[in-house]
Amino acid sequence: RLPPEASLLRMDIGLKLPMATTSAGRAYYCAISDKACLVIDDAMAAKFGDDWPEKKAGLDQAMKDYKEHGFCLSIGEWDRNINSAGVPIHLQDGTIMALTCAAPSYLVPAEKLRGSIAHQLAMLAGDIESLGV
């Protein structure tokens, strides 16, 4: 049984999350076309202004991580107390979704997320895709 503090992060279905700083947003960004990425980059550059280079660096790192390891991370970037991993799932109808695992950083340190959990998440996404959903 998890301690009560382990269940503090509650998210409702349909909650909107920032693309640039969450593992869910980053996973989605890594799965879309280059053309779509450019459209999103332009929109976020206008939205974030002087903060855009930092946000873009996070997206670029996520893309690198995804290409090398099959997952994206957000280590305290969306919320300084939350670490998360994300992977895209491609459905047969062309829909792209993100599968994520997030937890308080004191329960799941970055090393555990990067070294174990994120890899398992990527394998789970592959299993789901192989079901032909």
Residue map of PLM features:
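Short linear functional motifs in flexible/disordered or boundary regions
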Residues: 40, 111-113, 133
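Extended hydrophobic
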Residues: 52-127
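Acidic, glycine-rich loop-and-strand cores that form catalytic or ligand-binding grooves
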Residues: 44, 51
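Short amphipathic alpha-helical signal-transduction/dimerization elements
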Residues: 29, 33, 118, 122-129, ...
